């Protein structure tokens, strides 16, 4: 799945946290902004309440259920900046994509 396909699937499935903004930062692969305030998912690099830094490959593994979010965090594959509670709620968002 490409980042554009993922963005479209996330928008279609309302894969965002209501009232919150979370940015997925894939480094050189770009970003996805889940804007629960405006109920949109875009490839914008705007400001967010929480920024999740993870490689595109590791994100794909998490989305497929092959990599646990807590394991990714504990091993340094996933880094969180900002409101940690939003990051903790992302499992629910991921379940909308399976």
Question: Each PLM stretch: what is its role?
Answer:
Residues 1-98:
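Feature captures hydrophobic
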């Amino acid at each position: 799945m490409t980042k554009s396909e993922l963005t479209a699937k996330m928008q279609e499935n309302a894969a965002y946290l209501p009232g919150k903004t979370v940015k997925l930062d894939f480094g050189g692969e770009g970003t996805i902004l889940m804007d629960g305030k405006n109920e949109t998912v875009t490839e914008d690099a705007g400001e967010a309440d929480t920024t999740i830094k993870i490689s595109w490959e590791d994100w794909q593994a998490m989305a497929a259920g092959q990599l646990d979010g807590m394991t990714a965090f504990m091993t340094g594959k996933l880094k969180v900046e900002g409101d940690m509670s939003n990051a903790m709620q992302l499992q629910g968002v991921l379940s909308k994509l399976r």
